[in-house]
Amino acid sequence: MSRYMQRPENALKRANEFIEVGKPARALDTLQEVFRIKKWTYTWSESVIEPIMFKYLDLCVELKKSHIAKEGLFQYRNMFQLVNVGSLENVIRGYLKMAEERTEAAQQQSSQAILDIDDLDNLATPESILMSAVCGEDAQDRSDRTILLPWVKFLWESYCQCLELLKVNSHCENLYHDIAKMAFGFCLKYNRKMEFRKLCEKLRKHLEDISKVSSQTANVSISKPETQQLNLDTRLNQLDCAIQMELWLEAYKAIEDIHGLMTLSKKTPMPKTMALYYQKLAMVFWKAGNQLFHAAALLKLFQLSRDMKKNVTQEEIQRMTSHVLIATLAIPLPSAHPEFDRFIETDKSPLEKAQKLAVLLGLQQPPTRASLLKDVLRLNVLQLAAPQFQNLYKWLEVEFDPLNLCERVQNIIQEITVDENNPYAQYTQALQDVTLVRLVRQVSQVYQSIEFSRFLALAKFSTSFYLERILVDCVRHNDMQITIDHRNHCVHFGTDLSESQREDHPDGPTLQSMPSEQVRSQLVNMSVVLHRAIATINPNRNKAERDRLRAQMVKSYEENMVKEHQRILQRQKKIEDRKEYIERVNLEREEKELRELEEVARQHKLAEQRRLEQENEERERKRYENEVQMIKERNMKEKIDQIKQTAAGQKILKKFDEEDIKKMNAEEIAAKEAEERQKERKAHDNNLKSQEKKIDYFERAKRLEEIPLIEKYLEDKLVQDKQFWEKQEASRIEAAIAERKNAEAVQERLKRMQPDREIFWQKLKGERSNQFAEKLKAFNVALEEERKRRLTERVYERREERRQKWLREKEEERRRAEEEIRKQRQEEERIERERRAEERRIEDEKARLLEEKRRAREEEATKKAEENRQMQAKAREREREREADSWRDRRGGDAPAAAAQPNPAAQEATKPESGWRTAGAREPRGEDAPKKDGVYQPRFRDVRGGGAGGAGGVERRADDQESNKWRHGGDDGGKDDRDGPRRMGGDRPPMRRGGDDRDDRGPIRRGGDDRDDRGPIRRGDRPPMRDGERGVGMRREGGDRERRDGGDRRDFGGNRDRRDDRGGPRRDDRGDRGGDRDSAWRRPAPRGGDDGGNWRTRQDQAKPKDDRREERPKEARNTGPDEDGWTDVKHHR
């Protein structure tokens, strides 16, 4: 494993380097590290990972590491099964192809190892003889076990791993079935029967897994037609391989799987598939020794081919019908009492097995030999078969000729066995057995005893032992009475008159009944003969009885005809209703299932979307973390590479292992490096000093000792040099003299060539001078052009450089200006945010203070209201003590207004129809309501002098006294509105409504009135309004609209009659503003009269008024102005 995490491309390069130096295991570890690290899982594309995967699998195949290949394949599947399925398919196919090539190469190598024999004359060596004696294997088997089997095992494991990898992946479904077919071919090629069984079990387990309901949408669904067809094709291939390997049990299991898939499919399988299915099924039944179902399968194949196949030739029809006919005739004769009939109460397995086999053929019940022969005749198979097989049917099933039966059948069998490849040759033995049984039955009806030799002569194709076995089987299975007399060499047939062993007539040709049949048929024959005799003697004996019964039947029919007809109609109606109910229930159930499936699909889709989103987020997060980690690792690696370049750095890195280096950062490693360098420098300096001392000492001693030797050497050297110089000088002089003579001779020889040289030189010089002049001229021209071109290019380049420089400066200036603007805008936004936050904080604080004040006022108002209720309750108690009619005697006196009550009868007579009780004050509720006993209970106004807020004597409650505090800052007593304009004078009484006494209901209050007792609307309780809200316009909360219209608005001061005065000044609020709370114009109107006084200040008036305000004529109310000069106009409804 490498010391640091490799990038994928670097890991591939390093793996190739390991392979080049012969270390494939190290290369595999390097590539394996790439797939083990999760950080590379979703970062790199398949173009980067796919070559690494191919190299990784190549090394796994080379080293036969199937488990490591499995790990890499699973990681690669998780990476690219939803991104690029094609890449995954290419990788898996490449992996299996490499494994197959290596296995084939190993097989060739194993075969070649046997051929490489040193001595062809002595093939059996002593070693091979001993090995064959010990293990029982030949040389080829031993070679395969050592060379081929490891690769076969590796290839088998590769197939299993790939199938396990792709078993539930819908994106790789085709690849899964291709690999399954390749695995079948592998088992067939290398004759691996045990592996074939394991493979079939594995595929069956996978089919069961995908048949279960899965919550993941990416899984394989068996309900899809494509999946069903792929599984069906794979099982057909499995069946074919099982038949070729003669694994009949596996073939039968494959047939069951195929039938289950065809049953599961909603559409009918293709005729070609069904034909192949019936063909293979017939073969399996024949190999299992079940001739009955074999013939049934061939009959189904014939029906399918005749109905579905187009352009069928007459030869093909004859061949198929002949095959069906001979297979049906080859069915052994059924037993009179089969084994499962004898033990029907205790053992039902044979019957259940037959029923299961019938289901595979699509039959309702198990077939029989007789039923198949009937179908053969019904489907016209006999007439379409070959003539010789038609004769065979006639001889075995129709004619009774025991003397010539075996001879005729033998001739047909000889015609069949002439050709070894004849498909009917497999039926010869079965036909012989059926023929022998037919012979025994026919002979038993003709002869009572027959010599064994004569019997053997009639059975042309049988031996004595085989014939004896047939006789025993006839006694055992067909319940015939046969006795073999070995002493007299004869056979005796049943002569005992015992009970019959068969409940039906014997099939096949018969001449007469056997003696054993007489017991059963004797009574029946006697009854038939007696009835015939009676009918002959007295034919009219029962005629009257029959006529009476006939008349009775007709009468009963006529009586019950209508009733029976109605019953039948009712039954039909019930049946139709039941059908409709069932259809409706089924339709509802299907709709419900469809909705559930849609909901499940929608949930799956949502879950898949959420999963994909989570995966994307996780992938992005990991990619970001990986990039950060990669940058850190790259910096760390660069630092370590720099340290490695020095010897000190290499020593430092050797001192630490991989884990320590991973824990350290670049600064720590650099510090360690500097420290190590310092130590090395000190050690090196100390070493140099000691070496200096040694060298100085030895150098001095050496020089002192070598002085005399050097002097002697110099003297000898001087003598030798002198002698050497003399010798060299003499030889030099001799060589110079000889060289001089040779040069003179050469000079004399070359002087003769001087004229020719001069001529050639002048000629050549003339030619070359012209060429040189032309080339020089062309060069000068090209030089001038190149100079001009370069000057032009230089001008353009300088101009473009100046332009680009100007553009860069402009762009830089623009960026600086934008940056300044952006910073300024950010600063302004920050200041604005701080200002808004401060304003919100101030507003929240004001709102909190106002809320606290409102709560305090509400608590105070609640207390005051409670006190008022208690005082009013006491006043009502005192009032009950008075006489009920005392108030009538005081109508002309000076009683206070609170006690003066009008006559109810007179008031009712003079009162016009008006809605003053519903539009004015609401009737009191709770304990404040007047009693219903006919005595009027007076009500009292607020003792604190507040005006009555409603008509009809409704008391002013404590919460109504706060109605004037609706203005902003309601706790200041209305001082903020004193300077505003007033609607009426300070001493004027409140404005009256025209027409009736409803105008005596007191002043119009802006905060609500006593009719609903909902309390005042307090403006001061609301949070302060912003400037932007004030600009929209304030809504009037008074009754100005009612005053202008003169109508009878029933909600004085309510919110329903506000007018929207957006964008304009506020309406005239003179009704409530100005003055203090006790000013004259703010006081409520009196309960009676027109002087506008208060009942507490009018004790001296002559006529007390009734609180209930009697109704006055409407004309009197509208004839003149009021005391305050205002004239109200009645709104006529």
Curated annotation (Swiss-Prot):
Region Disordered: start-end pairs: 810-1133
Family to which the UniProt record says this protein belongs: Belongs to the eIF-3 subunit A family.
GO BP terms in the entry: formation of cytoplasmic translation initiation complex; translation reinitiation
Coiled-coil segments: 573-700, 784-886
Extent of Basic and acidic residues compositional bias: 810-893, 920-944, 954-1081, 1097-1117
Gene3D superfamilies: 1.25.40.860, UVR domain (4.10.860.10)
Record text on subunit structure and interactions: Component of the eukaryotic translation initiation factor 3 (eIF-3) complex.
Annotated S-S bridges: none
A Pfam family recorded for this sequence: eIF3a_PCI_TPR-like
Biased composition (Low complexity): 895-909
Residue ranges of every copy of the PCI domain listed in the record: 317-498
Biological function: RNA-binding component of the eukaryotic translation initiation factor 3 (eIF-3) complex, which is involved in protein synthesis of a specialized repertoire of mRNAs and, together with other initiation factors, stimulates binding of mRNA and methionyl-tRNAi to the 40S ribosome. The eIF-3 complex specifically targets and initiates translation of a subset of mRNAs involved in cell proliferation.
Keywords, sorted A to Z: Coiled coil, Cytoplasm, Initiation factor, Protein biosynthesis, RNA-binding
Protein name: Eukaryotic translation initiation factor 3 subunit A
GO cellular component, one term: eukaryotic 48S preinitiation complex
